[in-house]
Amino acid sequence: MNADVVIVGAGPAGIFTALEMLRRGSKKKIVMVEKGRALEKRSCPKAKTGVCMNCKPVCHITTGFSGAGAFSDGKLSLACEVGGDLPTLIGERLAQETIDYADKIYLEFGADEHIEGIGNEEKVRRIRARAIKAGLKLVDCPIRHMGTEKAHDVYLGIEHYLMDHGVEMYFDTECRDLIMEGDVCRGVYLTDGKKDFEIRAKHTVVATGRRGADWLEKICSEHGVEHQPSTVDIGVRVEVRNEIMEEINDVLYESKLIGYPKPCLLYTSDAADEL
């Protein structure tokens, strides 16, 4: 099969790649390949059993059209200070403009217009000042909270829109490798579990997301493609009495406090080993 563009992965990155091409009037033949299922065919047995069944070959919560987004609580963080290295890569101004642009697309497909965490500027200012005195930086981020059911409906609408506008989708289909001719990618080798086949394309977009990170790292290493993994935030959950956080929670829907420890000296038993 031949195509103008083949997109590997139908998570948010792959979805918005196809969506943006259509919005710009592209007439190119676009093919999306996803190892999970179409959204309306995704279901998790844990909803009935209460126990994770470790579904094979894929988890239907994290793979399939829209990735984990369709079964999340549908929170869209609308400030560039939250969520990744995009401001560092393209600058804060462009990052924020891009977030605002993507947010408008979600609204077009039915996302709730209400935004949490805005207003109360004076109360936020006072909380920020108190945080600074405590050696903390307050990050207050507006949140568009779609909710699980609305997130599912929004992504289902996007899926149908792409199909109605000619995007071909191959579900339950895994990318095995890239078709490389010299230093040029000419498409992808695929398998649907029953047969192997290939799609040759003028442009190949690999958008496998966090779930496909190990596979992408392997492919890049095999083909000599320079790459750098992004960071993964690991933290702990600390629960405190409501009275402690009540003021912040009443003013801010969702906030982050970044701590900056004071400089300190660490001594060992030997003064010469001062650090």
For every predicted segment, state its role.
Residues 18, 22:
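Gly/Ala-rich phosphate-binding loop of Rossmann-like dinucleotide-binding domains
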Residues 2-13:
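Beta1/beta-strand and adjacent pyrophosphate-binding region of the FAD-binding site
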Residues 29-34:
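Short beta-strand "acidic-cap" motif of Rossmann-like dinucleotide-binding folds
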Residues 3, 195-203:
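Core beta-strand elements of the Rossmann-like FAD/NAD(P) dinucleotide-binding domain
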Residues 203-252:
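Glycine-rich loop(s) and the adjacent beta-strand/alpha-helix scaffold that form part
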Residues 267-275:
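Single conserved hydrophobic/aromatic residue that forms the stacking wall/gate
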Residues 171-184:
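A conserved short coil-to-beta-strand element within the FAD-binding core of flavoproteins
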Residues 35-165, 222:
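Conserved N-terminal/central alpha/beta ligand/cofactor-binding core
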